[in-house]
Every structure is written in C-alpha cells, then in structure tokens.
C-alpha cells in the first residue's frame, strides 16, 4: 500500500519502527518481522502495519535494506525490481484498542474524535511466485 499512500498524500511516507524481531534460520526460513508506522514529513500517522518476511526469498542486499528500516517494505521491494503479487487479501474493520489508539492518537491513547473504527487489510505477497510476506496494514482514522 506504499504507492497508494504516496499518491493519496502527495509525498513519500516516512517510516518509524515500533518493534522488530528476527527468527533464526531454520526449517521455516530466516523470518524478519516488524511493526511500523507510515507518517507524513510533519509526523502525522497515516498507517500502522505489521509485516513478516521470509528473507530467504530475496537477495542479501535487499534483505539488508529491509533490516535497515529506512524505507517502507513496499518501496524496498519495488526499488529492487522484485516481481510481487499481492494475494489472499481480506479487508478488515478495526476498532483500535489502547496500543493502536496510542499509535494513532499520541500519548493519550485516544483515537481522533469521531473516528472509533477504521479499516485495513490482511494479505500475503508472493515474490517470484513464492509466498514470502504476510502483512496487516491499518489506515489511521482521519
């Protein structure tokens, strides 16, 4: 949804990592996960996301860029020229709990007035025909 956010807001998003984790390589691959916010240059939250990616499905240079967490995952994959197919998309209505409300509304943990519910998607992204990314993206209430 990186490109959609760029087009809608008229500027590239800034990335803020809320949390991250890396599992050791094993039978299920080398998985990297993170929770992020996409923000405007002024710091307004546009979107919250949680993503898990099988780093074994991409080249080492692209994996390093993902771990650096300077750009949204979508932008890294696009810049790397990887063939992406978004599939198994489910749209969800979300009523933010304390954690998400805090991310969207600041320290008070309050969602902006009149915005109790918001929407997002759950999806899987295949890279070169192989399932490699699982994601949840939730748009911040306006």
Please report, for each region that a protein language model flagged, where it lies by residue.
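Composition-driven recognition of glycine/serine/threonine/acidic- and proline-rich low-complexity segments
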Residues: 1-142
């Amino acid at each position: 949804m990186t490109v959609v956010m760029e087009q809608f807001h008229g500027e590239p998003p800034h990335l803020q990592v809320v949390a991250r984790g890396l599992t050791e390589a094993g039978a299920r691959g080398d998985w990297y996960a993170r929770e992020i916010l996409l923000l405007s240059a002024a710091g307004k939250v546009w979107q919250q996301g949680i993503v898990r990616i099988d780093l074994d499905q991409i080249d080492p240079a692209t994996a390093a860029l993902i771990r650096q967490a300077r750009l949204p995952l979508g932008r890294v994959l696009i810049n790397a020229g990887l063939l992406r197919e978004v599939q198994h998309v489910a749209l969800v209505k979300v009523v933010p709990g304390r954690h998400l409300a805090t991310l969207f509304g600041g320290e008070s943990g309050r969602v902006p007035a009149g915005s109790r519910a918001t929407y997002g998607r759950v999806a899987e992204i295949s890279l070169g025909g192989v399932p490699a990314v699982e994601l949840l993206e939730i748009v911040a209430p306006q």
